[in-house]
């Protein structure tokens, strides 16, 4: 039993990106979901930019500063977003198959705490742990000039 699983209660549907040729990574992701009592997840078959013909997705040439693997990664994330947009869900959590929920054990907050600090009209909220020794619990404030919130005049 995972005593920290409660911290992920309220997590939106997960779209997990996984290459068809990496079934062991999908199995590991499914095991992680089970350990964390996450049930609402979907596998998204990733594009492999090194092998797949992406000409029906990418028009023109790849950006000069991106290799084919990076293009495959970006297009896979776009594919996951398209899958999500077919639903009526208000938001989604898009991850790759190497995502690790283990640092959640050390959170002094829950997923619901995170969501309560995000502006109601957010479009994208990116989660990342770059340095697991430092966890910031407050999102950066939105640039007020770009906010869609009505002014109180």
Name these PLM-found stretches.
Residues 1-95, 99-138:
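An acidic/histidine-cluster motif and surrounding catalytic segment
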